[in-house]
A protein has these predicted regions:
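Hydrophobic alpha-helical
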Residues: 6, 20, 24-83
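Short beta-strand elements at the ligand-binding edges of bilobed clamshell
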Residues: 21, 87-99
Length: 143
C-alpha cells in the first residue's frame, strides 16, 4: 500500500517520476546496497523513499558512504530514524499510529461479529515527523 500511495501522489506531478523500485527484504544492509545501486544507475536521482522501517536508515548509510546528498524519506519512528530526521540526514518519516490501528481493528471486529456492515478498507491516521521536531497530523487527521 505504501508504494501504491506514493504512485497515486506522484501521478499528480508530471515533473516527477519514479525512476525505479527495489526491494530490501526489510534489511538495512540490503536497503543500503540497493540505494548505492540506484545512485550508480541514476546519478541524477534527487530523492530516495524507503518503505520499511529500516530502508530510510539503509539509504542514509549509502549516501554517507558515497559522500553525497539526496533527499531521503522514511517510514516509522525507530529511535535512530528520529535522530536522523532531527539531524537532517532524513528529511521526513511517516509514522503509523499502532494504538489507533489496534483499537480500530477491535472496533471493526466487534461490529462484524455483531452483524453490522464493516468497510472493506479502513485507513488510520499517520504523523509526519520532520526536522522541526513536531509530528504533524496527516491522512484523515490532517486539517
Amino acid at each position: 500500500l505504501r508504494l501504491e500511495g506514493l504512485r497515486s501522489i506522484i501521478a499528480n506531478y508530471p515533473e516527477m517520476k519514479i525512476a525505479d523500485v527495489r526491494t530490501s527484504d526489510i534489511s538495512r544492509l540490503q536497503a543500503s546496497e540497493q540505494t548505492r545501486s540506484l545512485l550508480a544507475a541514476y546519478p541524477d536521482l534527487k530523492a530516495v523513499v524507503g518503505f520499511s522501517a529500516l530502508d530510510g536508515l539503509g539509504a542514509l548509510d549509502a549516501v554517507r558512504q558515497l559522500k553525497t546528498q539526496r533527499l531521503l524519506f522514511a517510514f516509522d519512528d525507530l529511535d535512530e530514524t528520529k535522530e536522523a530526521v532531527r539531524s537532517g540526514g532524513i528529511q521526513l518519516t511517516l509514522v503509523q499510529q499502532p494504538l489507533e490501528m489496534g483499537s480500530t481493528a477491535i472496533a471493526l471486529l466487534h461490529d462484524y461479529f455483531q452483524g453490522k456492515s464493516v468497510p472493506d478498507v479502513s485507513y488510520t491516521s499517520i504523523r509526519l515527523l520532520d526536522g522541526s521536531g513536531s509530528a504533524q497530523p496527516a491522512g484523515e487527521d490532517a486539517p
